[in-house]
Amino acid sequence: MRHPLVMGNWKLNGSRHMVNELIANLRKELAGVTGCAVAIAPPDIYLDLAKHAADGSHIVLGAQNVDVNLSGAFTGETSAEMLKDIGAKYIIIGHSERRTYHKESDELIAKKFAVLKEQGLIPVLCIGETEAENEAGKTEEVCARQIDAVLKTQGASAFEGVVIAYEPVWAIGTGKSATPAQAQAVHKFIRDHIAKADAKVAEQVIIQYGGSVNAANAAELFTQPDIDGALVGGASLKADAFAVIVKAAEAAKQA
């Protein structure tokens, strides 16, 4: 049975005060939660502070991006070795904001995936279609292409112990969200697509939903059989809202 994971992507938000206050509040809100793994991805500059603030809790550290290089003359980048050294575990790659604003290709994201696996870190591979692609009926085609960038170069075994986050681009930060049935259909397609290469691997892959997940829609999303948690944006910056989402995932998967 898959163990749900709810991860907060803080994006470009934070301060020393905010990190300490938010994590302190999360610790209170999430006390006693054992049926759902919880991770947070603050900006890199606050990773060490967040690590100490979360020390002794069940909150696991993550990061929002990684470079393909481990060291060298690559100004402004953060390597997988550095993230591992500081204690990060779940590393987001392929987020639509990186694909759009930084022109990251499927091939580059696949390289990041490989580097993370080599370092023993867990990739959180974001995939998803734009509004235009959705309206053109290309959702499955786009998701398959983004998965195949890894599948065809690294094999199905590369997805062992990995997290995939399906984030329809049209739902990120817009207030729109896929209906539970829509999200489930895509999640099932993703799992079935990997299963064509290896059914056993596909069954254990955690597939999160992302895209305007909030306290109001989380519970219904998590009742779907192939939705294994969420990658949460704005709601992860509020301890009470984030805790509702985590508890909804725990309750749904224990039902």
Curated annotation (Swiss-Prot):
Active-site residues, record numbering mapped to chain: 95 (electrophile), 167 (proton acceptor)
Subcellular location(s) of the protein: Cytoplasm
Molecular function terms, GO-annotated: triose-phosphate isomerase activity
Its EC number(s): 5.3.1.1
A family per Pfam: TIM
Alphabetized PROSITE patterns for the sequence: TIM_1 (PS00171), TIM_2 (PS51440)
Biological or metabolic pathway of the protein: Carbohydrate biosynthesis; gluconeogenesis; Carbohydrate degradation; glycolysis; D-glyceraldehyde 3-phosphate from glycerone phosphate: step 1/1
Entry-linked HAMAP family: TIM_B
Assembly, per entry: Homodimer.
Function: Involved in the gluconeogenesis. Catalyzes stereospecifically the conversion of dihydroxyacetone phosphate (DHAP) to D-glyceraldehyde-3-phosphate (G3P).
Protein name: Triosephosphate isomerase
Organism: Enterobacter sp. (strain 638)
